[in-house]
Amino acid sequence: MDINGMNQMYESLGISREVREFAAETEKALRERFEAIDAVAEYNQMKVIKGMQDNRVSDIHFAATTGYGYNDLGRDTLEDVYASVFHGESALVRPQLMSGTHALHVALSGNLRPGDELLSPVGKPYDTLEEVIGIRDSVGSLKEYGVVYRKVDLFEDGSFDYEGIAAAINERTKLVTIQRSKGYATRPTLSVKRIGELISFIKNIKPDVICMVDNCYGEFVETLE
């Protein structure tokens, strides 16, 4: 279609020349940012493809299985791909995990025991975790099972309260949960670099503590995971 035909189509939809020119100027101003996003997306796409190649994914892995799912080659290989892409020792990728909150509950309840302490050094987590942890009373919460919850709020500028974090860690601190997304708060979303710095600080204080990152919506937005 020639330019005149395209202009007529826009006009028929009520999109004026001024709006089209404004959109073109905006896209031009953001071109470098769009190119940077495309570069990250392309890199991560290659990373996923390599993970599939390294684990020799083929048509056989897409065949249905029956029974209890023992030796489910497709499921096991999918988890191997996830582990490769995210550089993990292993992965748990199952349709039985119904939501992010469900996955976090599994991780928390699987690692914490009565008398252990859970620390959030980035303030209060998502509202959906309040009943899981026991911030709001709930049957079956971690609090009900004797897990103690502590939090250290970020400073107003979004920086970590390292002094407060160090003071909150003790011999009973078993797991530190770090929520990457700002959730419903106004703080900045955490970068991989900042999370790494925080974990290094915590590990220097208590090397055996478990650091769990809720990556919520953060997958593939950087070249590092």
Predicted regions: what they are:
Residues D2-F22, R31, V48-D54, H61, ...:
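Conserved PLP-enzyme active-site core in the AAT-like
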Residues A24-G88:
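Glycine-rich phosphate-binding segment of PLP-dependent enzymes
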Residues E79, V93-R94:
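Short secondary-structure boundary micro-motifs
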